[in-house]
A protein has these predicted regions:
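Membrane topogenic/interface segments and analogous intrinsically disordered interaction regions
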Residues: 1-243
Length: 243
């Protein structure tokens, strides 16, 4: 039977199967990650030289669960995207399917680049500045929960925000926006990005500044990408008219 002729019940059955496959994959990766949670913990805390403290035995378990969940989410993400794509692809036109598929690898790559940038550059820089403010005045003792929350708050938002160029490129390719619109609303976009940085990061000026700078650069990169795509579309249209 053709996919377009499937009933609602059959669609729901297929959706259930794909969702179950993703959940099982997540659970398996989670269990494996839990076995290596101590190594993951050492890797995540490599930028902090002191021993982190815990306030109770339950904290250790929750820390391991959070780390395993993060690993499972990151590793399972491509598999999840594959099932989403397989589910919606038959309902799309060939041009729409081609346009969306072209951005899937770029989207995942930008997510990983955002994670790496946040973890290796933004988090250590913010941590060094903030700890330096209290040097000689305070004895710094961070709990593992506090530290991991700090790392997640400065890393995961950047991973999501690094999707901005991909989103802008996709919207430009389907004609919803163009570089002129992005340039015209640049000042408002900067303000929104600043507010977004304040919301997503810990409540201090250094974190806000460290988050805002890459956001602005990403927005400018998005404008450049949008210009390139628009020029390519216009060139293709001119060539089509000539033929």
């Amino acid at each position: 039977m053709d996919r377009k002729e499937l009933t609602i019940v059959e669609h729901l059955v297929e959706f259930r199967k794909r969702l179950l496959a993703v959940v099982i994959c997540f659970f398996l990766v989670f269990c494996v990650s839990l076995l290596f949670a101590d190594q993951i913990y050492q890797y995540v805390t490599q930028f902090f030289q002191q021993k982190l403290i815990v306030l109770g035995p339950n904290d250790i378990l929750w820390i391991y669960i959070r780390l395993a969940s993060l690993m499972a989410f990151t590793i399972t993400l491509p598999y999840t995207v594959y099932h989403i794509w397989s589910f919606i692809k038959p309902g799309l036109k060939k041009e729409e399917a081609r346009a969306i598929f072209a951005y899937i690898p770029a989207s995942f790559l930008c997510f990983l680049v955002g994670l790496a940038f946040g973890f290796y550059f933004v988090t250590p820089a913010i941590l060094q500045v903030l700890l330096g403010l209290g040097e000689g005045l305070f004895e710094t003792q961070l709990t593992a929960q506090n530290y991991l929350s700090f790392v997640f708050q400065t890393t995961l938002p950047l991973a999501l925000i690094f999707e901005l160029p991909v989103i802008i490129a996709f919207l430009t390719s389907i004609g919803l926006i163009g570089p002129e619109l992005l340039i015209a609303y640049r000042r408002y976009a900067y303000f929104i990005l600043l507010v977004l940085a304040v919301i997503l990061t810990p409540a201090d000026f250094v974190s806000d500044l460290a988050m805002t700078a890459p956001l602005i650069l990403l927005y400018e990169l998005s404008i450049a990408i949008s210009k390139h795509i628009m020029k390519r579309k216009q060139k293709g249209a001119r060539n089509g008219n000539l033929t």
